[in-house]
Amino acid sequence: AKSKDDSKPAPPKRPLSAFFLFKQHNYEQVKKENPNAKITELTSMIAEKWKAVGEKEKKKYETLQSEAKAKYEKDMQAYEKKYGKPEKQKKIKKNKKGSK
């Protein structure tokens, strides 16, 4: 969380991979076709769809990913020039076991 005196905006977000762009594009349709499926099951179904699509379809998402990556790199350069390198965010590990 940002404090009030922290005037530095958040750095640009990393671009999504080609698969995640595909997932984003297909999620609602797969969910509509499988309304009772869990999120993990939906993701597996989308992964199967991804494996089944042709190279031409994958190329479309890879191109979108490349464009997003180029924009991210440009935005990141501008951010670093203005604010310096962003601090590394510490990953918060979620403890799956309940603590006693």
Swiss-Prot record:
Residues 90-100 have a biased composition (Basic residues). GO terms for cellular component: chromosome; nucleus. It comes from the Eukaryota. Its main location: nucleus. Keywords: Chromosome, DNA-binding, Nucleus. GO terms for molecular function: DNA binding. The keyword Nucleus applies. Residues 81-100 are annotated as: Disordered. The keyword Lipid metabolism does not apply. It is found in: Nucleus; Chromosome. It holds the Pfam family HMG_box. Gene3D superfamilies: High mobility group box domain. Residues 12-80 bind DNA. Transmembrane segments: none annotated. This is High mobility group protein C. It comes from Tetrahymena thermophila.
